[in-house]
């Protein structure tokens, strides 16, 4: 459990030097946000499966609703916020050399 909600890993593969893939389902509680962050070794692809999210990528905010998606290249700053009164659920597909929780740089900690 995180301060913004929770996630669960649905699928994970890739070993050694090959590209990795991880699929997660994230639930973001009403009024909560993921931190502004970027990843060195992985790209992410988000699909909204429930609710409406505000997604900021490289300083550009936009609203995404159910079945809408966005691709986030490695190294790009991004953030997801739930400004509604209902949970937001997304499927996150990670691909890259590392799909680990440690591959994260948070803007607030700089």
What are these regions (language model features)?
Residues 58-77:
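Short acidic-glycine-tyrosine-enriched beta hairpin
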């Amino acid at each position: 459990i995180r301060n913004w909600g929770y996630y669960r890993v649905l699928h994970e593969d890739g070993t050694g030097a090959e590209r990795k893939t991880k699929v997660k389902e994230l639930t973001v509680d009403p009024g909560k946000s993921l931190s502004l962050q970027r990843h060195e070794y992985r790209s992410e692809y988000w699909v909204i499966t429930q609710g409406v999210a505000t997604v900021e990528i490289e300083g550009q905010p936009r609203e995404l609703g159910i079945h809408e998606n966005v691709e986030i290249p490695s190294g790009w700053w991004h953030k997801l916020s739930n400004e509604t009164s209902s949970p937001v659920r997304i499927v996150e597909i990670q691909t890259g050399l590392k799909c680990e929780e440690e591959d994260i740089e948070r803007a607030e900690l700089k």
